[in-house]
């Protein structure tokens, strides 16, 4: 799988728990969830803020968050976020997620190619 530290983006988690990922992508995420995986505090906020999830999805998301390691918004992430915002047309939450990956040397698993693909230093895994 390459790098061993993975940050799972909100869109991938939502698709995964909504059973909307292709089978191959679902199996890939299954393998990652067996080990240690990461999310950003932004992912936590986004996941818990969704209104359109059913009870089963809500329970799965809460378990997903509880079993993850959450990166908080630390000073080095803030500094990297500012650099990203100055260099790319990217929304603040996505800039924080990208900065979190860069600072912590994580691969980002996301389907948000439009925003993240333009950051050359970011190791992006597209599902």
Predicted segments, located by residue:
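Acidic, PIN/NYN-like endoribonuclease modules and their adjacent C-terminal/linker elements
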Residues: 1-2, 98, 103-127
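Short, well-structured N-terminal submotif of metal-dependent ribonuclease cores
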Residues: 1-39, 49-62
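Histidine- and aromatic-rich ligand-binding microenvironments
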Residues: 8-9, 39-40, 90-91, 112-113, ...
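A generic structural signal for short hydrophobic patches within well-formed alpha-helices
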Residues: 13, 44-47, 78, 116
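Active-site neighborhoods of divalent-metal-dependent phosphate/nucleic-acid chemistry enzymes
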Residues: 23, 69-111
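Short, structured coil segments at secondary-structure junctions
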Residues: 33, 66, 119-120
């Amino acid at each position: 799988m390459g790098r061993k530290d993975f940050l799972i983006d909100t869109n991938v988690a939502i698709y995964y728990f909504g059973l909307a990922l292709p089978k191959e992508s679902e199996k890939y995420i299954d393998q990652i969830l067996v080990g240690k995986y990461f999310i950003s505090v932004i992912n936590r906020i986004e996941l818990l803020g969704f209104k359109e999830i059913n009870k089963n999805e809500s329970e799965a998301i809460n378990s997903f968050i509880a079993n993850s390691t959450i990166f908080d918004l630390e000073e080095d992430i803030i500094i990297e976020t500012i650099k990203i915002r100055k260099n790319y047309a990217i929304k603040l939450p996505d800039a924080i997620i990208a900065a979190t990956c860069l600072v912590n040397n994580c691969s980002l698993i996301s389907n948000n190619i439009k925003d993240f693909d333009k950051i050359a230093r970011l190791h992006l895994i597209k599902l």
